[in-house]
Structure formats: structure tokens, C-alpha cells
């Protein structure tokens, strides 16, 4: 089926019940549904939005096009959780149904004000000449989940920006509310702009200036900027589209990166003593990471395990995209560590010593120990011939390599089928989460992370130790959710 512009932007109410039922039936045939990762009820899931804590629950929304695996007319679907591991979908909350968001409810953030959750997002509007008008707008969600949209533009497109201006993130710094928005200037260079809420009024914003984070100005657009505080240190997470690979090498179509500062100077829109740019994730898919500071001060994050402008094998079943596990962010020795929240251990249903396994249910966690100066290769999602997802731990040369070239149906091969990162040549741990069509690998409790999708064949469900003598524990995971 061809996704024409007309079809992508067809009004929600114009889709028939028969068409929707056909989409659901097709999606049910997919062999790649996840068990403990969030996936869309139908269609496409992309950016996490509005990650927050409200009315005693963790809240996050996913951007959704419910009518197929395509980027079309977007809405926000709400999820809520008591533990950041089990999420319940409570329905579509932000629809593209006003003149300020008629062509899509794009990405944004959330913050509690009184008895309401303030949703701050980009309304995507196209005029009769199909020219885009990005409006930073808002809505209030009460404790019953009712949405009331704020009927005015909160931040308009600046005169010095193209129509690529989006993804507002609201945050609190020392009792004052601020927001950052990603954009592209008239020279087609990416920037992040800082705003201040006048009298802490979330409907009244004043520009402070472009955030100074030692921007190298090689990216043409800054998507999904998030400023979060890890301890006292500001950490800027962002997606610099088009970043020059001489600045920092990466393999994916678009990168997701971060910088750490020693302090934040909002009056001068400055991150002080900014670190070198670093990759957030060394795998094949991790994008649009959203983070916020929880009421207890922890910095929590979640990512879209998918990428723009990539076709996936699951597309033919009318679904695409999952979320990563929710991770807690910490800083150790100047490095950002990302590791799943402690409640993930509650999924462990059984444990056994790690060994070769002819067959698994492809929903498990491995906790591995690798000795210094050792070399090991393990194949996950392995078939009888030993083909699958290969992970090579080379602690002689200090490198980890992930190879998905023999793991099921291939896609996005023009961006390579291997990913690697450097690690210290010393004893190393790895926590590896496999979930049907998702893998997440955490080296040394989150010092380095690899995330990605794989679409294994039906007979790819074993574990093979191809070389070396890694030891550890195999945990079968049970989320309680039915998958096919």
C-alpha cells in the first residue's frame, strides 16, 4: 500500500470500522510482538512524550499514527505505571483536532501544576500551500484524564528560525520554570533555545537566548532536546541531525547524543564547563530519548527504539516501534550511566546458570561476567546453524561488537549491520535483555549501552556460546502480558 500524503493526513474520523478491524487483524499476525517492552496498540509508535509523575502515577505518552506503520497524522496515547515496568494504556489523550494542531500533535513534555498535568507540545499545522507552521501549544489533563486545550500559541515560530522548530521541554530549576525548544536557524544550522516562564505562568514564555552548550553548529537540526539534572549537574540530551562525523562518529541515520555540564547558568542561557559530545547508545536504534527529574530527584529516561526514515520488517503487519526500558541516569567518573530501574528485577520468574540453550522463549535477561584479557562470542536468537544476533566481547583489545547480519529479516543495511564501542581491558559485566524483537545491552551496569531491533526467523530462539568461557545467570522474564 502506498502511503500518499492524502492517506497519511486523512482525518481520524474518516477511517471506517472495517479498515480499523483489518489493521488489528493484520497486526495480530505479526510474529514480532514484544512481551515486556511498550509497543503500539496499532500502527506506529515513535517519540516518548510527557514523561512525568502525576496523581501518584508515572505517566508517559507515545506519539502514534494508529492506521499503519507510517508517519502520518500524529496523536498522543497515554500510558501509566506504578513501577515504571508495567504500563497500562489509558487511551488517546491528545488528538490533532484544533486549528493549532490540525496536522499532528508532535513531541513535547509535561509538568504538574496544581491538580492538573500541563502538556507542552508542538502543534503541526499545514496551510493551503502545504507550508508548515509549528506552534508550541499546551493542554491540561485533570486527574480523571480529561483534556482541556489552551486556546492560544504559547511560543510562536521565531523570526530567525525555519519551520523546523519543535519539541518543547519544560523543567524546573531552583523553583523557576524554564523550557527549551529545538530548532533550525535561517542558515540551516541547529540550535536549542531557552525560555523562561514569566511569574512561573506556563502560558507566558519569554526567550532568554540560545542555549550555550558549545554547539559545534554542524548539525542542521536539533531534535528532542532535554535538559535534565543528574545530581547537581546539567545533562543535555539531544538528536543533532546531520552532525558532522568528524565531530563524533556514528553509524545510524540520525544520532542521539549528550553533553554534561558542571552547572547551569539560566540567566545567561549557559551550561558551564561542558563535556565532550558522547553517544547515548551504541546500538542500531535509540532515538528521541526523553528524560525528566522525578519528585525524588532521580533522573529517569526512556527512548524510542526506532528511527525516522527507516522501513522495518514489521511494517507489513501494520506496526512499528517500541519503547526502551525505563532507565535511571547517574554520573560516574564524568560518564553518563544508564541502567534499567530496579523494578525490572520483579520480572525475573526463574534463574539458572548461563549455558548454551537449544531453545528459549526469547524473553529473558542474562547477567554475564567476562574475565579480563578474555575473548568471548555469544549468539542470541540462534538457530541450529548458530546464526543469530552475535555479541563479541574482546577484552584483549577493549571492544564490544554487536552483529545482526544473521539475525532474521534484514533492513537498513545501508547503515551497516554491526555496531561497536570501546571499553576498558578489564573484567566486565553485561546485562542483556532479549524481548522477541528487541535487545538492550548494558555494559558495566550502564557505562555503555547498545539497543536495537531484530526480526528473527521462527527457528531463531537459542543461545550459543561460540567462543570463550563467559559465566553468569539466565533469568526467564514474565511480564504477565500475553504475546503471540
Regions found by a protein language model. Give the residues of each.
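Beta-rich accessory regions
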Residues: 3, 18-20, 254-484
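Beta-rich carbohydrate-recognition and catalytic domains
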Residues: 1-103, 107, 111-167, 172-218, ...
Amino acid at each position: 500500500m502506498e502511503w500518499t500524503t492524502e492517506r497519511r493526513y486523512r482525518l481520524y474520523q474518516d477511517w471506517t470500522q472495517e479498515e480499523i478491524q483489518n489493521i488489528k487483524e493484520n497486526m495480530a499476525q505479526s510474529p514480532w510482538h514484544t512481551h515486556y517492552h511498550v509497543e503500539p496498540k496499532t500502527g506506529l509508535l515513535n517519540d516518548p512524550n510527557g514523561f512525568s509523575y502525576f496523581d501518584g502515577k508515572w505517566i508517559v505518552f507515545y506519539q502514534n499514527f494508529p492506521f499503519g506503520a507510517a508517519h502520518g497524522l500524529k496523536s498522543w496515547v497515554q500510558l501509566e505505571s506504578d513501577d515504571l515496568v508495567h504500563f497500562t494504556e489509558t487511551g488517546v489523550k491528545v488528538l490533532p483536532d484544533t486549528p493549532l494542531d490540525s496536522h499532528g500533535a508532535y513531541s513535547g513534555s509535561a509538568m504538574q501544576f496544581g491538580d492538573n498535568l500541563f502538556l507542552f507540545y508542538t502543534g503541526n499545522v499545514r496551510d493551503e500551500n502545504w507550508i508548515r507552521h509549528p506552534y508550541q501549544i499546551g493542554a491540561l489533563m485533570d486527574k480523571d484524564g480529561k483534556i482541556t486545550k489552551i486556546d492560544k500559541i504559547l511560543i510562536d515560530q521565531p523570526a530567525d528560525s525555519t519551520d523546523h522548530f519543535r519539541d518543547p521541554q519544560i523543567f524546573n530549576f531552583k523553583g523557576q520554570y524554564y523550557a527549551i525548544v529545538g530548532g533550525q536557524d535561517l542558515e540551516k544550522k541547529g540550535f536549542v533555545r531557552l525560555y523562561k516562564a514569566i511569574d512561573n505562568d506556563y502560558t507566558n514564555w519569554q526567550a532568554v537566548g540560545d542555549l550555550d552548550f558549545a554547539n559545534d553548529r554542524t548539525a542542521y537540526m536539533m531534535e528532542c532536546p532535554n535538559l535534565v539534572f543528574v545530581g547537581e549537574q546539567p545533562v543535555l540530551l539531544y538528536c543533532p541531525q546531520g552532525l558532522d562525523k568528524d565531530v563524533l562518529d556514528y553509524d545510524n541515520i540520525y544520532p542521539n547524543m549528550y553533553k554534561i555540564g558542571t552547572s547551569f547558568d539560566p540567566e545567561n542561557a549557559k551550561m558551564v564547563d561542558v563535556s565532550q559530545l558522547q553517544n547515548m547508545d551504541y546500538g542500531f536504534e535509540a532515538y528521541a530519548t526523553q528524560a525528566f527529574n522525578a519528585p525524588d530527584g532521580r533522573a529517569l529516561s526512556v527512548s524510542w527504539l526506532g528511527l525516522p526514515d527507516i522501513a522495518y520488517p514489521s511494517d507489513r503487519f501494520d506496526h512499528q516501534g517500541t519503547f526502551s526500558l525505563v532507565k535511571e541516569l547517574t554520573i560516574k567518573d564524568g560518564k553518563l550511566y544508564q541502567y534499567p530501574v530496579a523494578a525490572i528485577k520483579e520480572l525475573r520468574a526463574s534463574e539458572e546458570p548461563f549455558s548454551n540453550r537449544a531453545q528459549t522463549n526469547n524473553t529473558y535477561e542474562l547477567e554475564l561476567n567476562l574475565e579480563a584479557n578474555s575473548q568471548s562470542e555469544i549468539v542470541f536468537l540462534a538457530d541450529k546453524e548458530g546464526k543469530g544476533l552475535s555479541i563479541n566481547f574482546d577484552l584483549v583489545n577493549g571492544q564490544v561488537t554487536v552483529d545482526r547480519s544473521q539475525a532474521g529479516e534484514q533492513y537498513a543495511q545501508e547503515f551497516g549491520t554491526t555496531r561497536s564501542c570501546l571499553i576498558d581491558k578489564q573484567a566486565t559485566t553485561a546485562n542483556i535483555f532479549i524481548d522477541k524483537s528487541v535487545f538492550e545491552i548494558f555494559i558495566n551496569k550502564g557505562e555503555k549501552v547498545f539497543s536495537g531491533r531484530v526480526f528473527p526467523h521462527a527457528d531463531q530462539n537459542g543461545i550459543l556460546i561460540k567462543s570463550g568461557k563467559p559465566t553468569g545467570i539466565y533469568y526467564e522474564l514474565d511480564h504477565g502480558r500475553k504475546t503471540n
